Amino acid sequence: MSSKILSENPTELELKVAQAFVDLESQADLKAELRPLQFKSIKEIDVNGGKKALAVFVPPPSLQAYRKVQTRLTRELEKKFPDRHVVFLAERRILPKPARKARKQQKRPRSRTLTAVHDKILEDLVFPTEIIGKRVRYLVGGNKIQKVLLDSKDSTAVDYKLDSFQQLYSKLTGKQVVFEIPGESH
């Protein structure tokens, strides 16, 4: 069970999710895909309506393996943890912008910049659905709201989670975002 968790001192919630992983691994059709999968940590975040969201942070190299079984795994974990939306995110590192005075050691890769990491978090949040467009609205006070347009073909799978996605992204990055599915009126 603790072989599924990569952190040294797992919390009670992480142990419960690891146990759920082990239980799901006992099913023959998921066994091969779930055996190598591990996660680093889990954050439980309160969202609107008294619901909670579980953000499961996974190592970036194993994200592709998670994507293969993510829809099924999410469905099964949401059954085991009712009133919680489950989201899988890669745990990415943001390197600080190099100071002008600092000696140039190594160029900071684009994948470690704040913008790139926040964009990847957005893609991970809405995974089965694709992002088809982004718009930025500037408010009078100088605040920005990012409007994210999602593909309408997967709208039934993600529609009920849009508020959770919005709250999660806001808590993780501090940026305001609005998710919209074109062709639907809200």
Curated annotation (Swiss-Prot):
Which keywords accompany this UniProt record? Cytoplasm, Ribonucleoprotein, Ribosomal protein
What InterPro entries does its record include? Answer: Ribosomal_eS7, Ribosomal_eS7_CS
Q: What biological-process GO terms show up in the record? A: ribosomal small subunit biogenesis; rRNA processing; translation
Location(s), subcellular: Cytoplasm
GO CC terms on record? cell surface; cytosolic small ribosomal subunit; small-subunit processome
Which Pfam families did the record assign? Ribosomal_S7e
A GO molecular function annotation here is: structural constituent of ribosome
Q: What PROSITE patterns does this protein's entry cite?
A: RIBOSOMAL_S7E (PS00948)
Q: What is its main location?
A: cytoplasm
Residue spans crossing the bilayer: none
Family the UniProt entry places it in? Belongs to the eukaryotic ribosomal protein eS7 family.
PANTHER family in UniProt: 40S RIBOSOMAL PROTEIN S7 (PTHR11278), SMALL RIBOSOMAL SUBUNIT PROTEIN ES7 (PTHR11278:SF0)
**What is the role of the protein in this entry?**
Component of the ribosome, a large ribonucleoprotein complex responsible for the synthesis of proteins in the cell. The small ribosomal subunit (SSU) binds messenger RNAs (mRNAs) and translates the encoded message by selecting cognate aminoacyl-transfer RNA (tRNA) molecules. The large subunit (LSU) contains the ribosomal catalytic site termed the peptidyl transferase center (PTC), which catalyzes the formation of peptide bonds, thereby polymerizing the amino acids delivered by tRNAs into a polypeptide chain.
Assembly description: Component of the small ribosomal subunit. Mature ribosomes consist of a small (40S) and a large (60S) subunit. The 40S subunit contains about 32 different proteins and 1 molecule of RNA (18S). The 60S subunit contains 45 different proteins and 3 molecules of RNA (25S, 5.8S and 5S).
Protein name per its UniProtKB record: Small ribosomal subunit protein eS7
